[in-house]
UniProtKB/Swiss-Prot annotation:
Name listed for the protein in its UniProt record: Acidic phospholipase A2 homolog
SMART domains, A to Z: PA2c
Domain of life, per lineage: Eukaryota
UniProt-listed PANTHER family: PHOSPHOLIPASE A2, PHOSPHOLIPASE A2 FAMILY MEMBER
One of the GO biological process terms: fatty acid biosynthetic process
Keywords from the named record: Disulfide bond, Secreted
Subcellular location(s) per record: Secreted
Disulphide-bridged cysteine pairs: 11-70, 25-117, 27-43, 42-98, 49-91, 59-84, 77-89
Annotated function: Snake venom phospholipase A2 (PLA2) homolog that lacks both catalytic and neurotoxicity activities.
UniProt GO molecular function: calcium ion binding; calcium-dependent phospholipase A2 activity; phospholipid binding; signaling receptor binding
Length: 118
């Protein structure tokens, strides 16, 4: 779920969570358009991963709770998660690690979606 995703991002990155919420074209719920950079591409991939997770019965990625641990920037999704939870956890894990490895461009924060996101 989104609270757990926030915690994962905070575990892997030194940036405040809110720096990612309105970044680029794809880092907000319902984001769309060609990614502006690597970090925005992380968000697009995360959104696409959630779309795949929704294929499991009654799987709602934004709300699904899962079990995981995070220590020293290493995230482990627990093996006892059901299919939906495992899928969502892996989506969030992959995105959090992607965020941590991608450069942050302040010019891509709070962009004008109509002019910059086609």
């Amino acid at each position: 779920n989104m609270v757990q995703f926030k915690s994962m991002v905070q575990c892997t990155s030194t940036r405040p969570w809110l720096d990612y919420v309105d970044y680029g074209c794809n880092c907000d719920i319902g984001g769309t358009g060609t990614p502006l950079d690597e970090l925005d591409r992380c968000c697009q991939t995360h959104a696409n991963c959630y779309t795949e997770a929704r294929k499991f019965p009654e799987c709602a990625p934004y709300y699904k709770t899962y079990s995981y641990t995070c220590s020293g920037g290493t995230i482990t999704c627990n093996a006892d998660n059901d299919e939906c939870a495992a899928s969502v956890c892996n989506c969030d894990r992959t995105a959090a690690l992607c965020f941590a490895g991608a450069p942050y461009n302040q010019n891509n924060f709070d962009v004008d979606l109509e002019t910059r996101c086609q």
